[in-house]
Curated annotation (Swiss-Prot):
Alphabetized UniProt keyword annotations: Aminoacyl-tRNA synthetase, ATP-binding, Cytoplasm, Ligase, Nucleotide-binding, Protein biosynthesis
Pathway info: Aminoacyl-tRNA biosynthesis; selenocysteinyl-tRNA(Sec) biosynthesis; L-seryl-tRNA(Sec) from L-serine and tRNA(Sec): step 1/1
A GO term from the CC aspect: cytoplasm
Catalytically driven reaction(s): tRNA(Ser) + L-serine + ATP = L-seryl-tRNA(Ser) + AMP + diphosphate + H(+); tRNA(Sec) + L-serine + ATP = L-seryl-tRNA(Sec) + AMP + diphosphate + H(+)
Organism: Haemophilus influenzae (strain ATCC 51907 / DSM 11121 / KW20 / Rd)
Residues involved in L-serine binding: 235-237, 289, 389
Comment block on domains: Consists of two distinct domains, a catalytic core and a N-terminal extension that is involved in tRNA binding.
Top EC class of this enzyme: ligase
Known partners and oligomeric status: Homodimer. The tRNA molecule binds across the dimer.
Main location as per UniProt: cytoplasm
Name of the protein described by the UniProt record: Serine--tRNA ligase
């Protein structure tokens, strides 16, 4: 949620930025009308409350003098009814303003390139050289099936399209990748390993910006009797970031750095026909997520650090990748600046997204009321929140299988993973 003061004091400027940079049309006439109503109702309720307080004192004085206060009490009742009605109208207007505010995307940072879609993203760097093969390259589907480790037919039987079953050495490598990532982030990058619920309530989803706008992207549960509805997490960013919801943090404790390995669940609404085969786009996939809660003056510096932590995973696995700064038209709803890391996938002869690292500025913090305060200060400030994949485990598995394949269909195990796989150096045939 962007700063409401910007909407009140710089509405035309904000609307123009949203139109140009986000292709978002803000209904300024409606918002202006609602804001006028809010101001009028605010004045009305304050005046009625002040008048009611004054009359209450007058009734007390009249009673002390032994006067008949019945007419005064009747007036008080009437004024109370007016106040109740005015407050109800004010609450309704505030709720409508809030709903509009919740639908507005974050404003991009000034350095974010203007563009309509991913074709206008800006490449920052490339690391590593894609391998040259002297044999016909197989995709991860073929490699996994030949190793008796990937079973998409079983996934379809158990659940449907966009599910897979992993077995044996492939399943072991998948687990090894997640453990390797967690150990790297906790032992070398300073993150606190965190275990969180995979089901969350709607307040949590509002906090990080999935609701109300992106409900169709989630898997929702039916509310059980006496319980609230839940949704399966689309990313560990949701529960981990919300750990600071409604919390005032001592600034001396910042930054707070947390990581979690969780399954993620996405409906992939709007992705019909895209990546229908393989592990690239699944309804259920594992991811190691990094979250930072930082001093609001240091979030851009933190974004570079966090992105570097994701890059380190790829570098240690010796997987070629490129780093891309997303343009305004390709950014996520709540982000003010995002880097994507794209790993080389030989069978597709292209780079594919494997990590997205974002500075959310104070967008999520305002929704969550996550604040910080320096010792001795009375005033609080909204923290800044950042998140990034470190990495998507399934897509990393895809990259390892394809980049480390051999002519006989076997896969060389990257050196960094061998301690997690009982010393195995080759899997498959």
């Amino acid at each position: 949620m962007i700063d409401p003061n910007l909407l009140r004091n710089n509405l035309a400027e904000v609307a123009e930025k949203l139109k140009v940079k986000r292709n978002f049309m803000l209904d300024t006439e409606k918002l202006t009308a609602l804001e006028d109503q809010r101001k009028n109702l605010q004045v009305t309720t304050e005046n009625l409350q002040a008048e009611r307080n004054a009359r209450s004192k007058a009734i007390g004085a009249a009673k002390a003098r032994g006067e008949d206060i019945a007419p005064l009490l009747a007036e008080m009742d009437d004024m109370g009814n007016q106040l109740t009605e005015a407050k109800a109208q004010l609450d309704a207007v505030l709720a409508e303003i809030n709903q509009i505010a919740l639908s507005i995307p974050n404003l991009p940072a000034d350095e974010v390139p203007l563009g309509k879609d991913d074709t206008e993203n800006k490449e920052i760097l490339r690391w590593g050289t894609p391998r040259t093969f002297d044999f016909e390259v197989k995709d991860h589907i073929t490699l996994g099936e030949e190793a008796n480790g990937l079973d998409f037919a079983a996934g379809a039987k158990l659940a449907g399209a966009r599910f897979a079953v992993m077995k044996g050495q492939i399943a072991k490598m998948h687990r090894a990748l997640a453990q390797f990532m967690l150990d790297l982030h906790t032992e070398q990058h300073g993150y606190l390993e965190t275990y969180v619920p995979y089901l969350v309530n709607h307040a949590t989803l509002y906090g990080t910006g999935q609701l109300p706008k992106f409900g169709e992207d989630l898997f929702h549960t039916l509310a059980l009797e006496g319980e609230q509805p839940y949704a399966l997490i689309p990313t560990a960013e949701v529960p981990v970031t919300n750990l600071v919801r409604d919390v005032i943090i001592d600034e001396a404790e910042l930054p707070i750095k947390m990581t979690a390995h969780t399954p993620c669940f996405r409906s992939e609404a709007g992705s019909y026909g895209r990546d229908t085969r393989g592990l690239i786009r699944m309804h259920q996939f594992d991811k190691v997520e990094m979250v930072q809660i930082v001093d609001p003056d240091k979030s851009m510096e933190a974004l570079e650090e966090l992105t570097g932590h994701a890059e380190k995973v790829l570098q240690l696995l010796n997987l070629p990748y490129r780093k891309v700064l997303l343009c305004t038209g390709d950014m996520g709803f709540g982000s003010c600046k995002t880097y994507d890391l794209e790993v080389w996938v030989p069978a597709q002869n292209t780079y594919r997204e494997i990590s997205s690292c974002s500075n959310m500025w104070d967008f999520q913090a305002r929704r969550m009321q996550a604040r910080c305060k320096a010792k001795g200060d009375k005033k609080t400030r909204l923290v800044h929140t950042l998140n990034g994949s470190g990495l998507a485990v399934g897509r990393t598995l895809v990259a390892v299988l394809e980049n480390y394949q051999n002519a006989d269909g076997s896969i060389t195990v990257p050196e960094e993973l061998r301690p997690y796989m009982g010393g195995l150096d080759v899997i498959g045939k």
